[in-house]
């Protein structure tokens, strides 16, 4: 068999390693964290044992029964301390085993690619490797998009899919699920506890990178305590967690202090607005104009021009004059639930940055790259096709001729492709015998004649021996009208 080359213009293994560097960054970071924890654990145990030995020596040197009893107790404490230390040590060692296994599996995965690339006579191993890699991307997407609303019967779709394919060690689902869990707690449940726990474990990294996450999280905690009227706890939170940021976030702390004084006014206005919107949705007096005005006000938060000049009695609140204050408007923004979404974005940015993971879905990135290389200026245009007098002709032409196999125009990928740039080329197709019809449409003469014969054979239309039908505008032309084209 003659030696052939790969049908794919394939980049080398180093390229793939750089592209998937996070596959090794995550286990490495986990091992580093484990190592730091072990060092702290060992240092703490050494200090504790030294203290025990000092007390033991003092007790043994006393030379009396009471001292001997203390020495015996110290020995028991030393044994107990060492046993606890061994258990903690073993726990950390056990946690490292699956991490090291992941690294080994991933190294072998890229060795498979290297071996597949060497088999130039058979691209099957290379295609199998890419299929496995595609499944990893699908598993990543499913894992990232697992929500608290997912059906219990489905469990964790991403993890289940990866296990079924036998590639669970090629993706760090635990890291993705942890990030997803914290993100869901923020956006769906407005729960700060998982985030604060993660911040506490990642303080050194956040401080090293100058992150605002800890401040914003504690600021949100302070705001939620004020909303719940837990003023003492809010003040304690301010003193314990926010004051240390006075040099870097002075303006925000000023607003935090002002919010404490204005919170009751803010809550009253929020209640008034909520009541007004509720009334708009529930009230219906049968007056079409009034209903239209209420709907407009609800969606656009202002009166339509037709009634702007009419006198409307203001809400009778003694504090409404405060709303003209610029700071007061800032306080209202602090109470807006949109802050949870902003906090979530800040968390995900730092979280994925820690592990070197792309914040965007890798599957969508790869799809976007592939689609953008195929997208031309002719893509995504809705074709206008004329209807003929015969429904059967329209159906057969649509099925046999006008079927669009372009992946960019496919309804599945069109939403992704719409915002992507055009490729620096156009797709051209040369025919052996291109002809132009009088209406300007260009076709391959053989295919046009074959279509005419097919439609006549199935009795969809009556055509003369030298007549053809344009599949676009459904007009009938004679072969004598063909204009021969010459590609240049």
Swiss-Prot record:
The keyword Heme does not apply. GO terms for biological process: negative regulation of apoptotic process; negative regulation of gluconeogenesis; proteasome-mediated ubiquitin-dependent protein catabolic process. It comes from the Eukaryota. GO terms for cellular component: cytoplasm; GID complex; nucleus. Its main location: cytoplasm. A zinc finger (RING-Gid-type) spans 406-473. Keywords: Cytoplasm, Metal-binding, Nucleus, Zinc, Zinc-finger. Residues 175-233 form the CTLH domain. Transmembrane segments: none annotated. Disulfide bonds: none annotated. It is found in: Cytoplasm; Nucleus. One of its GO terms (molecular function) is ubiquitin protein ligase activity. Belongs to the FYV10 family. Involved in the proteasome-dependent degradation of fructose-1,6-bisphosphatase. This is Protein FYV10. It comes from Candida glabrata (strain ATCC 2001 / BCRC 20586 / JCM 3761 / NBRC 0622 / NRRL Y-65 / CBS 138).
């Amino acid at each position: 068999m003659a030696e052939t080359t790969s049908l794919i213009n394939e980049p080398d293994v180093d390229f793939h390693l750089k592209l998937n560097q996070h596959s090794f960054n995550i286990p490495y970071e986990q091992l580093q964290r484990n190592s730091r924890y072990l060092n702290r654990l060992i240092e703490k145990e050494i200090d504790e044992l030294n203290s025990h030995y000092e007390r033991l020596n003092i007790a043994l040197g006393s030379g009396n029964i009471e001292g001997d009893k203390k020495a015996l107790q110290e020995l028991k404490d030393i044994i107990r301390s060492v046993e606890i230390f061994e258990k903690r040590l073993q726990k950390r060692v056990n946690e490292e085993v699956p991490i090291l296994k992941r690294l080994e599996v991933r190294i072998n995965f890229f060795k498979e690619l290297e071996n597949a690339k060497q088999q130039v006579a058979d691209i099957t191993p290379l295609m199998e490797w890419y299929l496995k890699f595609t499944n990893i991307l699908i598993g990543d997407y499913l894992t990232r998009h697992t929500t608290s609303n997912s059906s219990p019967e489905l469990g964790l779709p991403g993890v289940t899919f990866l296990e079924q394919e036998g590639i669970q060690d090629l993706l760090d689902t635990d890291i993705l699920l942890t990030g997803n869990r914290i993100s869901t707690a923020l956006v769906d449940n407005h729960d700060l506890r998982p985030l604060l726990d993660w911040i506490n474990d990642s303080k050194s990294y956040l401080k090293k990178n100058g992150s605002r996450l800890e401040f914003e999280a504690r600021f949100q905690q302070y705001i939620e305590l004020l909303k719940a009227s837990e003023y003492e706890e809010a003040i304690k939170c301010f003193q314990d967690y926010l004051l240390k940021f006075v040099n870097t976030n002075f303006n925000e702390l000023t607003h935090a202090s002002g919010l404490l004084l204005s919170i009751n006014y803010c809550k009253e206005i929020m209640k008034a607005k909520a009541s007004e919107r509720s009334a708009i949705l529930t009230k219906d007096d049968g007056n079409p104009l009034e209903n239209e005005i209420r709907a407009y006000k609800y969606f656009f938060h202002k009166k339509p021009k037709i009634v702007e000049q009419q006198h409307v009695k203001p809400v009778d609140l003694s504090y409404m004059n405060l709303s003209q204050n610029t700071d007061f408007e800032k306080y209202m923004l602090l109470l807006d639930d949109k802050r949870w979404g902003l906090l979530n974005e800040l968390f995900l940015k730092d979280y994925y940055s820690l592990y070197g993971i792309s914040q965007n879905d890798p599957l969508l990135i790869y799809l976007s790259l592939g689609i953008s290389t195929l997208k031309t200026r002719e893509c995504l245009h809705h074709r206008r096709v004329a209807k003929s007098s015969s429904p059967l002709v329209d159906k057969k032409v649509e099925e046999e001729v006008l079927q669009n196999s372009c992946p960019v125009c496919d309804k599945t990928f069109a939403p992704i492709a719409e915002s992507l740039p055009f490729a620096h080329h156009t797709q051209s197709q040369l025919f052996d015998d291109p002809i132009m019809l009088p209406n300007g449409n260009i076709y391959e003469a053989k295919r046009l004649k074959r279509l005419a014969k097919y439609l006549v054979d199935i009795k969809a239309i009556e055509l003369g021996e030298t007549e053809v039908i344009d599949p676009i505008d459904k007009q009938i032309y004679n072969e004598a009208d063909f204009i021969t084209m010459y590609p240049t």
